[in-house]
Amino acid sequence: MTWSATARGAHQPDNTAFTQQRLPAWQPLLSASIALPLFFCAGLAFIGLGLGLYYSSNGIKELEYDYTGDPGTGNCSVCAAAGQGRALPPPCSCAWYFSLPELFQGPVYLYYELTNFYQNNRRYGVSRDDAQLSGLPSALRHPVNECAPYQRSAAGLPIAPCGAIANSLFNDSFSLWHQRQPGGPYVEVPLDRSGIAWWTDYHVKFRNPPLVNGSLALAFQGTAPPPNWRRPVYELSPDPNNTGFINQDFVVWMRTAALPTFRKLYARIRQGNYSAGLPRGAYRVNITYNYPVRAFGGHKLLIFSSISWMGGKNPFLGIAYLVVGSLCILTGFVMLVVYIRYQDQDDDDEE
C-alpha cells in the first residue's frame, strides 16, 4: 500500500522549534557547591519565617472558658445535667464571671470552640443542598437525596434547610456585661454580629428564595424546619438582612471544619467605649445553654482573643516552618560530611 505525500504529512506537527523540541534548554548540574548552599539558605529562610510566625502567634492574648458543664465545674453543670439524654434539651441559662486586671487590647474577637465534633465526616459533609441554599425555588421544594434522613419531615414536607449540617446548627447564645466600678451596675457590652461570615459565602453562595408578596415566611410556606431546630429558618433573626439562608450564624456554621476541634467566630467587640479593647474590671457572660455535647464526648468553650497580621492564635504554622528549616540545615550538614569524606577518596583514586 502506497501513501501519498499529502497523507503522510496530514498529522505532522509544524516545523517550529517548539513543536520539534528544538528550544534551548539548561539543566543545572547539582554539584556539592550548588546543592549545599541551597539547603543552608532554605533552612535559614524557613527558620527565620518560623520564628516570626511563632512569636507573632504567642503575642496574641486569649481568654477561654470551658462551659461544657461537667459535674463540679460551675453553674453550667446544672444546665448540662438537665439536658442529658435529650435531643432537644430545655432552655437553660448560666453565667461566667471573670476579671481583667488591665486592658485586653483590641480588636477583640469572640469565638466558640467545639471538640470531638467531626464535621469532616464524609456523609456529614455532603449532607446539604447547595442549590437549595442558593435560593432556587425548585430546590427548596425538592431537596437532594444526600440530605437524607433530614430531607423531608415526618409529615412529608421538604426540610429547609435540609441535611445533617443544618440540623446540627450551633444554637448557644451569649451576652457580655461589664462592671466598671466595684459594686456598680453591669453595663452590656455591644457585640457586633455583622460581617462574621466569609464575603463569598454571604454574597454569593447563600441566598434566600424570592419573596412572596413581600414576605419571606410565605416564601418558605410548605416547608419544615430541621428536627433539632426550635424555630423555622425565616425566624432566625428579626433583621430582614440577617435571617433565612443569609443568617450570619447559619452561614458560618455551614462552612465545615477540617479538624474535630475547631473554632467559629461568634462576634467582634469594636463599638463604643470598647473599640480599643476590653477595659479593666469585672465581667459577666450570660450563656443560653442549648447545645448538647456530652452525648458524643465533646466540650464547648468560649474564647476571647485578639488578632495579629496573621489572624488568630495558631502556633502550628510557625512550628512547621521551624521543623522544615531545621531538617534542611541538618540535611545540609549530613551532605557536607559525606562530600568531604568521599571527596578525599576520589582524590586518592585519581592519584
Curated annotation (Swiss-Prot):
GO molecular function terms noted in the UniProt entry: aminophospholipid flippase activity
Record InterPro entries: CDC50/LEM3_fam
Bilayer topology annotation: Multi-pass membrane protein
Compartment(s) where it occurs, according to its Swiss-Prot or TrEMBL record: Cell membrane
Membrane topology, Exoplasmic loop segments: 55-315
Chief subcellular location: membrane
Cellular-component GO terms for this entry: endoplasmic reticulum; Golgi apparatus; phospholipid-translocating ATPase complex; plasma membrane
One Pfam family of this chain: CDC50
Disulfide bond positions: none
Glycosylated residues (UniProt): 75, 213, 286
Subunit structure: Component of a P4-ATPase flippase complex which consists of a catalytic alpha subunit and an accessory beta subunit. Interacts with alpha subunits ATP8A1, ATP8B1, ATP8B2 and ATP8B4.
Family to which this protein belongs: Belongs to the CDC50/LEM3 family.
Protein name listed in UniProt: Cell cycle control protein 50B
Organism: Homo sapiens (Human)
Organismal lineage: Eukaryota, Metazoa, Chordata, Craniata, Vertebrata
